[in-house]
């Protein structure tokens, strides 16, 4: 199984709280993969640039990417994005642009999106998601 970690879950994991996130990671099977979207990676880098300790933040991100692979765009992401951006707009229920890209990246891989931002992501009915904070 591929598990794509949303930005909030990555931050929880880096801070080791809530501890249940690390516990869930430790319970994964050997063939399970932890990944993050390039969008999540960009959000982390943006946060590092805005932090008071840039070098420490960048080092923490580098260590994280040794365990969680960063995945980059493909054509399928764009197809899902086009579909869901229009579907949600027509429903009058759009979500944040970065969240939409992350969701579409997970859809393109048939991955389970791990997030605490359930309110936004549950609008995308094709998306598999789990909240590991519960």
Curated annotation (Swiss-Prot):
Entries under InterPro entries matching the protein: PIN-like_dom_sf, PIN_dom, Type_II_TA_system_RNase, VapC_family
Enzyme Commission designation: 3.1.-.-
Upregulating conditions: More highly expressed in early growth phase, expression decreases as cell density decreases. Part of the vapB1-vapC1 operon.
Name under which the protein is recorded: Ribonuclease VapC1
Stretches assigned to the PINc domain: 3-132
UniProt-reported outcome of changing residue 92 to V: Loss of toxicity
First-level EC class: hydrolase
Any one GO molecular-function label of the UniProt entry: RNA nuclease activity
Outcome of mutating residue 127 to H: Loss of toxicity
Effect of residue 7 to P: Loss of toxicity
